[in-house]
């Protein structure tokens, strides 16, 4: 059986070959396209041989394509499928790689956004901190300026002289402080005098001229009581003195045939004077005086409560009369201190009667103390007041423990040494 092929098929085949050649020139060359072109070429050749075979009249002829062509076509088809598999693998790997890159890009973008956010927050915090510091600095500057203005205003007010408003108050304060100072001085002097007289009376000794002069000087200057702190004296340089006793040989000197401490057989009593007790008594008197200073217009009412306080204040003369009347008390304490025309008469008695009369020619020392009891000690010994310039006591015999000028002369010291040979320069000590 002979099969005739129409010429249309051959024309179609030629046109297809031309289109393939035109398409081949337009495509991009790579493995896949080259393999695909080879497959198409082998297939086209096999189809041409098959058509030539069909044209022949003998039907027993073999197929139009040979075995080698079939093998080549098979290899090309396998290669094409391998290339497609490799392409699929590459595409999958590329997609995964792209996905990984996309995830990494998103993470980086997220981190960048977070970093920018943190940076913005830190910048905001820094700005807020700077604003707070600036505000605090401004507040401190304003406070310092206000303080400086207040200080300047205070200084200006302090330097200003407003006599119309401040003069009466200052005058009143000055008068009150002056009265308090006078009262304090009189009470301190009276307490000091009473303390010394009481100690002398209890020890049974008479007053020497030294003691009389000392009492008068303390009455004349009541402010010296504040400088009688015995514990502040440094007596370490005097080897003969200690805290419990004194050497009575320095007090044996008498003036104008008067009696000293040893003439009354009571010299040993002065070795037992307790300095701390005297100091405590003085401090108690001063403290009681200071506490009583604030209660200037108040008096203690005892027994019948009949007390009269009269205060008359004038320009240069202030008379303070305080009277307290009790049942069994008829003694008065009169302390006369002339200071700027101030007369202070204090008559007090809490069942305690004290009479002290200090005159320049007084020869009797009377002390009256007691609670409903009157103890009067009259020292009838002759006492003579020695007029010593500056209220200084007469020199006394210091004994053998003190060096004199003759002792220095006995040392044969060359006071003219100038220190030229490395010796001590004594020229400045030459007497």
Swiss-Prot record:
<dbReference type="GO" id="GO:0051123">
    <property type="term" value="P:RNA polymerase II preinitiation complex assembly"/>
</dbReference>
<keyword id="KW-0539">Nucleus</keyword>
<dbReference type="GO" id="GO:0045944">
    <property type="term" value="P:positive regulation of transcription by RNA polymerase II"/>
</dbReference>
<dbReference type="GO" id="GO:0005829">
    <property type="term" value="C:cytosol"/>
</dbReference>
<feature type="compositionally biased region" description="Low complexity">
    <location>
        <begin position="143"/>
        <end position="152"/>
    </location>
</feature>
<dbReference type="GO" id="GO:0005634">
    <property type="term" value="C:nucleus"/>
</dbReference>
<feature type="modified residue" description="Phosphoserine">
    <location>
        <position position="6"/>
    </location>
</feature>
<feature type="modified residue" description="Phosphoserine; by CDK8">
    <location>
        <position position="208"/>
    </location>
</feature>
<dbReference type="GO" id="GO:0034976">
    <property type="term" value="P:response to endoplasmic reticulum stress"/>
</dbReference>
<dbReference type="Pfam" id="PF11214">
    <property type="entry name" value="Med2"/>
</dbReference>
<keyword id="KW-0597">Phosphoprotein</keyword>
<comment type="subunit">
    <text>Component of the Mediator complex, which is composed of at least 21 subunits that form three structurally distinct submodules. The Mediator head module contains MED6, MED8, MED11, SRB4/MED17, SRB5/MED18, ROX3/MED19, SRB2/MED20 and SRB6/MED22, the middle module contains MED1, MED4, NUT1/MED5, MED7, CSE2/MED9, NUT2/MED10, SRB7/MED21 and SOH1/MED31, and the tail module contains MED2, PGD1/MED3, RGR1/MED14, GAL11/MED15 and SIN4/MED16. The head and the middle modules interact directly with RNA polymerase II, whereas the elongated tail module interacts with gene-specific regulatory proteins.</text>
</comment>
<feature type="compositionally biased region" description="Polar residues">
    <location>
        <begin position="162"/>
        <end position="178"/>
    </location>
</feature>
<feature type="compositionally biased region" description="Basic and acidic residues">
    <location>
        <begin position="105"/>
        <end position="140"/>
    </location>
</feature>
<feature type="compositionally biased region" description="Polar residues">
    <location>
        <begin position="366"/>
        <end position="387"/>
    </location>
</feature>
<keyword id="KW-0010">Activator</keyword>
<dbReference type="GO" id="GO:0003713">
    <property type="term" value="F:transcription coactivator activity"/>
</dbReference>
<feature type="region of interest" description="Disordered">
    <location>
        <begin position="284"/>
        <end position="399"/>
    </location>
</feature>
<protein>
    <recommendedName>
        <fullName>Mediator of RNA polymerase II transcription subunit 2</fullName>
    </recommendedName>
</protein>
<feature type="region of interest" description="Disordered">
    <location>
        <begin position="105"/>
        <end position="178"/>
    </location>
</feature>
<dbReference type="GO" id="GO:0060261">
    <property type="term" value="P:positive regulation of transcription initiation by RNA polymerase II"/>
</dbReference>
<dbReference type="GO" id="GO:0070847">
    <property type="term" value="C:core mediator complex"/>
</dbReference>
<comment type="function">
    <text>Component of the Mediator complex, a coactivator involved in the regulated transcription of nearly all RNA polymerase II-dependent genes. Mediator functions as a bridge to convey information from gene-specific regulatory proteins to the basal RNA polymerase II transcription machinery. The Mediator complex, having a compact conformation in its free form, is recruited to promoters by direct interactions with regulatory proteins and serves for the assembly of a functional preinitiation complex with RNA polymerase II and the general transcription factors.</text>
</comment>
<dbReference type="GO" id="GO:0090399">
    <property type="term" value="P:replicative senescence"/>
</dbReference>
<feature type="compositionally biased region" description="Low complexity">
    <location>
        <begin position="318"/>
        <end position="365"/>
    </location>
</feature>
<feature type="compositionally biased region" description="Basic and acidic residues">
    <location>
        <begin position="304"/>
        <end position="313"/>
    </location>
</feature>
<dbReference type="InterPro" id="IPR021017">
    <property type="entry name" value="Mediator_Med2_fun"/>
</dbReference>
<dbReference type="GO" id="GO:0000122">
    <property type="term" value="P:negative regulation of transcription by RNA polymerase II"/>
</dbReference>
<keyword id="KW-0805">Transcription regulation</keyword>
<dbReference type="GO" id="GO:0032968">
    <property type="term" value="P:positive regulation of transcription elongation by RNA polymerase II"/>
</dbReference>
<dbReference type="GO" id="GO:0016592">
    <property type="term" value="C:mediator complex"/>
</dbReference>
<comment type="similarity">
    <text>Belongs to the mediator complex subunit 2 family.</text>
</comment>
<keyword id="KW-0804">Transcription</keyword>
<dbReference type="GO" id="GO:0061629">
    <property type="term" value="F:RNA polymerase II-specific DNA-binding transcription factor binding"/>
</dbReference>
């Amino acid at each position: 059986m002979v099969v005739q092929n129409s010429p249309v098929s051959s024309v179609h085949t030629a046109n297809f070959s031309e289109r393939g050649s035109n398409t081949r020139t337009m495509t991009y060359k790579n493995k896949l396209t080259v393999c695909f072109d080879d497959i198409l070429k082998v297939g086209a050749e096999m189809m041409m041989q098959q058509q030539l075979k069909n044209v022949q009249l003998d039907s027993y002829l073999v197929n139009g394509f040979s075995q080698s062509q079939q093998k080549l076509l098979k290899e090309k088809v396998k290669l094409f499928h391998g290339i497609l598999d490799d392409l699929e693998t590459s595409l999958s790997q590329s997609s995964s790689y792209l996905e990984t890159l996309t995830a990494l890009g998103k993470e980086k973008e997220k981190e960048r956004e977070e970093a920018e956010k943190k940076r913005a927050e830190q910048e905001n915090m820094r700005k807020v901190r700077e604003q707070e510091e600036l505000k605090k600095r401004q507040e401190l500057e304003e406070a310092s300026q206000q303080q400086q203005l207040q200080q300047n205003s205070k200084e200006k007010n302090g330097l200003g002289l407003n006599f119309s408003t401040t003069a009466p108050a200052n005058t009143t304060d000055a008068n009150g402080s002056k009265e308090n100072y006078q009262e304090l001085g009189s009470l301190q002097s009276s307490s000091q005098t009473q303390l010394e007289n009481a100690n002398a009376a209890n020890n049974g000794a008479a007053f020497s001229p030294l003691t009389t002069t000392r009492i008068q000087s303390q009455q004349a200057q009541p402010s010296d009581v504040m400088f009688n702190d015995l514990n502040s004296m440094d007596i370490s340089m005097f080897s003969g003195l200690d805290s419990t006793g004194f050497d009575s040989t320095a007090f044996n000197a008498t003036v104008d045939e008067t009696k000293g401490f040893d003439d009354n057989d009571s010299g040993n009593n002065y070795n037992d004077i307790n300095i701390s007790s005297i100091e405590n008594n003085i401090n108690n008197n001063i403290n009681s005086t200071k506490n009583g200073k604030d209660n200037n217009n108040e008096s203690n009412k005892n027994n019948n409560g009949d007390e009269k306080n009269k205060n008359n204040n004038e320009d240069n003369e202030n008379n303070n009369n305080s009277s307290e009347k009790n049942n069994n008390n008829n003694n008065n304490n009169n302390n006369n201190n002339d200071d700027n025309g101030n007369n202070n008469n204090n008559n007090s008695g809490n069942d305690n009667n004290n009479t002290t009369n200090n005159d320049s020619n007084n020869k009797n020392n009377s002390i009256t103390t007691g609670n409903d009891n009157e103890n009067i000690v009259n020292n009838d010994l002759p006492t003579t007041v020695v007029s010593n310039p500056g209220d200084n006591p007469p020199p006394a015999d210091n004994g053998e423990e003190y060096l004199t000028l003759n002792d220095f002369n006995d040392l044969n010291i060359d006071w003219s040494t100038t220190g030229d040979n490395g010796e001590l320069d004594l020229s400045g000590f030459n007497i």
